């Protein structure tokens, strides 16, 4: 169902998996534990890339173009993982009702890519984003004191 991943261009794999999971639920179709695990990992990667883009885009709106690029670069690595798994970077169309289009091409490579992202690339990117934004005078001036709610 190639139109599903196009509904959310920010994290298309999440829509793809959500739609197929909903159909499986309607028809009482169960997936293998391996399929569920792969889907969960891909959804989490999609969620993380979504947050990276969100923080980067917010920083861009508030004067931090470098932060946007940092978040975007790591998002690209998630697309590399999707490309490895499904053969497509942006609209993976990887899930099917009851399973996946195909198994992982190489489980060890997949694990290495995911571990590299989670344990090395992501912590560095988050740290860099925090450092850039928490010390960016323009960013701080535009946000500090905005939307403050008092007890009253």
Region annotations inferred by a language model:
Residues 1-152:
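Active-site bordering "gate/hinge" segments
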